Amino acid sequence: MSDHEGASPASSAPSSPLVPVSPRSDHNAPESPSGDVADLYKDDDSPLAPRSPASPRKSPENSPVGSPVKTTKVVISSDEDSDDEGPSSKKQRAVLSDSDASDTEATTKKSRITLDSDDSDQEGDKQQKRKDLFGDDSDDDDFDRPKKQNDDLDELVKGDLEEDRGEQQRPIYDSDDDDGPSDRRGGRNFEWDFDKMLAEKKAERKRKTRRGKDGGIDIINDDDGMVAKLVEKMKHAAKSDRNANVERKPAFQKIKMLPEVKAIMLRAGIVEVLIENGFMSALSEWLAPLPDKCLPALDIRITVLKLLHNPRFWKLDRSTLKQSGLGKAVMMLYKHPNETKENKAIANKLIGEWARPIYHLDTDYSTVSRQEREERDYSRMPEKRKKKLHSREEEPDEDEAPKRPRIRDAEGLGPTKSLDLKPGDKGYINRARVPKPSTKDYVIRPEWRVSGEFKGEKKASGSKRYDQTLRDFQERTRKSKANRLVKVSLEGRNMGI
């Protein structure tokens, strides 16, 4: 039996001359639970150690004489080595094992992601068929899907690698050494009290300012807080009155607050503040019927409708009326059979003013020219009237013109149609006719020929003194005549003694 025949089976197999085994490795060492240690810690990127399952180990005896022996760093966990090694070597071994385990996990995750990408391709084919049948919401997704899938795969791989690196670094920072981060106050979620104070001040300044319609910044006064408190009180009063109505008790909370609401609505320049703080919604609750289908108090309805029928509240936009429900509340009062005639008239005018922007009608008639008035009237003219107007503008032929009796008027200025005949004229039919609405369009405004206002007849200033003297004289003579008419009794009756 030769020297080589007594060797291990690994030595008898054809060995690779590139990767020798360290002299420390002996055949009596216990096997690692994770498999072959040399294969696990072998450098994947090294050109000298290609990964091959059939590459056997080579002992130092089979290596050629004089050739340099290359060793690989292999760590074998044994009881003797663990006793001899210090804490620093244990820490290094833990870091190396975590890093190598993370590399293997990353490799398996990449393979898993590749399989998922194949499944996603199949799913993409299904989605493409579904698009061909039913269509898609946007066409841009069809062109961007392959790029998005590749980006998603790259993000998944990067995220997994970053998590693995974080897990590797976490045991080192959690040790007793002071090499870790110095932030002991909660990490990234820590926030200084000074930053909190600055954020509160910034939010307070943001509440105190608002953007105007022209893009400028308007400073809001202290009316916001007052109006907000008033709105809360108004809603609470409306709720109390509804509860009292359900319990068959007198509801007087809104009546008590009516003077306060009237005072705030009469203030100038506060309409925008009222709208922003929800005053209109509270006002609609005040005008809404009670649970027993009865209207609110008459004083509330009269006061609120008169205050709303102010030019300041005519310019409420459509969104405000819709969100607050104020338009529905006023319309309900206009259509309610128990509402008074005066309140219905005010509600009708108010609805007409609010509806003008919906029909694109201007509220200021002084700036409208004659041509604009004619165009607006023509656009609002019914189709039948337009056809008649076009037929009149066209000059009909004498043969096709309808034959109507024509006469000369009294002054002989021109012909007159039979419809314009007066009683006593030839062809006039003296009978009653059904009145019809006039289809005339009055576009010419009559001119005002009076220069100044007429206040009545004025008397001369010189006669005032004479009239005053005459009135004084008449009063004195009237008193003297009254004294003379006293009857004197000869017998001494009615005498003051």
Swiss-Prot record:
Region annotation (Disordered) maps to: 1-191, 369-433
Q: What is its main location?
A: nucleus
Residue ranges of the TFIIS N-terminal domain? 281-361
* Nucleotide-binding listed as a keyword: no
| Record GO cellular component, one term | nucleus
Q: Which GO terms describe its biological process?
A: poly(A)+ mRNA export from nucleus
Name any one Pfam family assigned in the record: Med26
Which spans does this entry mark as compositional bias, Basic and acidic residues? Answer: 123-134, 144-160, 181-191, 370-382, 401-411
Q: Where is the composition biased (Low complexity)?
A: 7-23, 47-57
Keywords of this protein's UniProt record, alphabetized? Nucleus
Whether Cell membrane counts among this entry's keywords is no
Question: InterPro entries recorded for this chain?
Answer: RNAPII_TF_IWS1, TFIIS/LEDGF_dom_sf, TFIIS_N
Q: Where in the cell is it found?
A: Nucleus
Give the record's family classification.
Belongs to the IWS1 family.
Q: Fetch the PANTHER family from UniProt.
A: PROTEIN IWS1 HOMOLOG
Name of the protein in question: IWS1-like protein
